[in-house]
Amino acid sequence: MTQGKIIKVSGPLVIASGMQEANIQDICRVGKLGLIGEIIEMRRDQASIQVYEETSGLGPGEPVVTTGEPLSVELGPGLISQMFDGIQRPLDRFKLATHNDFLVRGVEVPSLDRDIKWHFDSTIAIGQKVSTGDILGTVKETEVVNHKIMVPYGVSGEVVSIASGDFTIDEVVYEIKKLDGSFYKGTLMQKWPVRKARPVSKRLIPEEPLITGQRVIDAFFPVTKGGAAAVPGPFGAGKTVVQHQVAKFANVDIVIYVGCGERGNEMTDVLNEFPELIDPNTGQSIMQRTVLIANTSNMPVAAREASIYTGITMAEYFRDMGYSVAIMADSTSRWAEALREMSGRLEEMPGDEGYPAYLGSRIAEYYERAGRSQVLGLPEREGTITAIGAVSPPGGDISEPVTQNTLRIVKVFWGLDAPLAQRRHFPAINWLTSYSLYKDSVGTYIDGKEKTDWNSKITRAMNYLQRESSLEEIVRLVGIDSLSDNERLTMEIAKQIREDYLQQNAFDSVDTFTSFAKQEAMLSNILTFADQANHALELGSYFTEIMEGTVAVRDRMARSKYVSEDRLDEIKIISNEITHQIHLILETGGL
């Protein structure tokens, strides 16, 4: 433990002298109030400290004491359905301790509740040999999450005592005799430094799709469990709603939502909506699988930088249990702005637009902690982390450094489009500029599992949208009447795909989530209509005949998005009606 004294205060950056014994990444207590800070640079005996609390009132001469530990999070029962700030302070218990609606400086509250007793069920016998990652037992944390207690990293040996029963998280639950003869006394909780990735046994290629219930994502731009996606877009294009929708309905075991530098109202929406929503996969409240990290725009800037790492470390902990985890970061641009501010105060050489030269490597560091892995320990298990980051480029300009560095790393780009949002087409994901590099592997996976030709259907639907885009220019110049019947039919089918399939109402109780079976039925109907109508044109029918003769059935296709999941048969029989209707048109008109 080293004690120094402050010689300079510059916003969230404090410089202290007499710190020659300290190390980079050590946590310090700064000033008389004991504010939390982290050493980010050492020059001789001077330490530059990033302070995670408001620094007003700090002055030269005040003491700085190092703890000798890096910034770490507490991992154990009590994480789920809690809300923390960027450095894992529990906001509800912080309010009870301080009787204040705002974060009072210098107050220390344990991250996990020390008073709650959790029922621990041992799954291992005394005398058994264990090593890092082995599951010792379970704690039923919520109706949905079975919290697995694992041997901490770096510990291996023989279990000499373990007992089932009710324990708080700091009571000794088991004892391991290590290989060197010393004894390790273990609790239900372990600590881990946030800037260090938790080790795994083996990295695997992601294959299984993350089903989000959002048709444009699942069909055209899928992300796998263990993949990484970016959602850039201008203000008002719907980034936060896309993130909320994925957090609500993704088929994962755990969701970690990091509100990083965005408005506080968005976190309030999450707190109001999530407890009332039912997870379609488990039938329980969505809050029972969610951890919230709130670092809103009115909280200290430096803590934004930590919040992303806090979230991904928690995600790695649940992945090590063998769970699939989705982490949403809204927004990584605010995190990058925090990096830029600290870099400027450290007087480092600026890169593009004032961001530090190491911006790209920091963004890569975060996204590379996502993935599908075979984790350490027995029984053998796989876990996944899917990282979805919103990016808020100023003015919607995706050529700026944060977006460009993000797109170099992630394999899925959901590009939100201001013109689509202005036309009230939501989700406003532009199907011509967005992409997914997982598309082929996901299509092959679904074709094999569901025994469908999903891949070819998606390709055909996308072809219609691309042909519509090239025909739109002709229509704008010389009018729709200049098009042939075949081209007008292409425009009509593309319009159906856009309005009846891609457009989705997040605030409608039925349309907010679409299962894969319903998505497939809806798209099949549109493509059946395309096949039958093209066939009728080949046999001599007119475009206007086909449109007038299929008004009722096309109306049913348009309304099928509002048909509930338990009435799927009503959607599936529409394809028979389309075929019947086109046959009637051929019998009465055409040749």
UniProtKB/Swiss-Prot annotation:
Keywords: ATP synthesis, ATP-binding, Hydrogen ion transport, Ion transport, Nucleotide-binding, Translocase, Transport. CDD domains: ATP-synt_V_A-type_alpha_C, ATP-synt_V_A-type_alpha_N, V_A-ATPase_A. Produces ATP from ADP in the presence of a proton gradient across the membrane. The V-type alpha chain is a catalytic subunit. It comes from Streptococcus pneumoniae serotype 4 (strain ATCC BAA-334 / TIGR4). One of its GO terms (molecular function) is ATP binding. It comes from the Bacteria. One of its GO terms (biological process) is proton motive force-driven plasma membrane ATP synthesis. This is V-type ATP synthase alpha chain.
